[in-house]
Amino acid sequence: MASRAIFVFPPFRLDAANEQLWRDSNRVDLRPKTFEVLLYLVQNAQRLVTKRELLDSVWAGASVSDELLRGYVRELRDALGDDAKKPRYIETVPTRGYRFLPRVNDESSVQTPPSELKPAKAPRELRVGILHSLTGTMASTESPVVDATLLAIEEINERGGILGREIQPVVIDGASDERAFARQAIALIAEAKVCAIFGCWTSASRKSVLPIVEQRDHLLIYPTQYEGMEQCSHIFYTGAAPNQQIIPAINWAVGFLRKKRFFLVGWNSIYSRAANAIIRDEVEASGGEIVGEEYVLPDSTEVTRVVRTIAQTEPDLIFNSLVGDMNLFYTRLLRAAGITPEKIPTVYFSVGEIELQSLSAREIVGDYAAWNYFQSLDRPENHAFVKRFRSRYGRHRVVADTMEAGYLGVHLWAQAAHATDPDDVAAIRRALPNQSFEGPGGRVRIDAENQHTWKTMRLGRIVEGGQFEVIWSSEKPIRPEPYPSSRSPTAWNEFLNKLHTAWGGNWTKSQSAISQLDDGHSAE
């Protein structure tokens, strides 16, 4: 059957050569990738097509989420007038794949529609990569960013794409492993031929992808708040720089809460080490004191010791830079030790609405988080964004800062692509500076000098229901400064290089390698 140019399952005719689907004499519009999914199912009519087989055929072996595939099947059912519960065309075989039910007739029985009814063939699609952790420790945190990124792509495609060309996402799993991120970035550029990569969360994953986009003259759009100390012409940063999150939070804790004694909790990553170095500089410059600085590993028994140390030192406030699932065990032990927000509050730098879904209200209500965006923001643009997201993914879903930053990154890139040749990665990089967008959290703009984004900073108090009450906001968007002013760029680069060397050339490391450092802050 694969050699046929025309496939018929009344009242539909599928013209493979011209990538057209007809219902009687009426053309049925399908996106290019949706057509490819249908074509493969039709070519293999009346037999089970596994998900893996379908993904390998249509996406050439690239890693694509099941949710994305289900979205294309839903589109097909809508176009065919099919019912998932009582299918006439596409049957879902739970956990296995799909079966195209109708018998497909020989092409000899087909009368091709008049040529005058055939529109011009649509221009080819624009492929973009989405590279986040869909498995491993970071999956629960990163997967929602994929959803927000896909939502932005869908919005742009609904408006005609980029110069009439549909954006086709290629979603790949970084597996919570910096080496996997590097391998997958190469695959996206060399094999999938994407014209941009949206992704990475941890600084370790970004640092692993950085030399790849540099060497291949490519483009990464990075959506996460981070420690700064970096400026790469091949990366555009839509998350917060330190002066847009960490430093204002310190100033607020010292100036508004009047706290003097601080405890720092992080994990064995470049982000936590660098963030805590920034905090130490700022706190000591203000006359405050760091009474403890500890780092934990995922699932580490060291968490119990860290909590015991916090109880013994009795700080005024804890700054927490743990990420992903690491906060679950730590927070429960903290509360079990009697350390509550009323006694010793915590300011989180990586806990947002997504993470709050995994923590019970009694464990976290009253603590604080520093971000640029909260779902609770009362802005028309935000209400519309939340409504669209929930309409697409379910009313139970929440949105968070990095999801909004991922969403912004797609729209900023699309504006730059519209303004130049969308296939020319270097031209898009030149067009991105000074692009601005009215996002859910306010107007943002890419700085022309450092490729970071002007953003409004906000502090939120955790309230019942897993949301935040905004208690402080900067008066206007803050210009990004990737290198904190407490040290020179050279000194910060030396700080990072010392960590990288101590960790055996990696950006995260096991506890045994951490012990090579003299103490919790000797890399300074």
Where are the regions that the model predicts?
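A structural micro-motif at secondary-structure boundaries
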Residues: 4, 13-35, 105, 113
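Defense-system signaling and execution modules centered on TIR/cGAS-STING-like, death/scaffold domains
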Residues: 101-122, 522
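DNA-binding patch around the recognition helix
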Residues: 2-7, 29, 41-46, 64-111
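Short amphipathic alpha-helical recognition elements used for nucleic-acid or partner binding
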Residues: 26-58
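Extracytosolic ligand-binding ectodomains
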Residues: 118-524
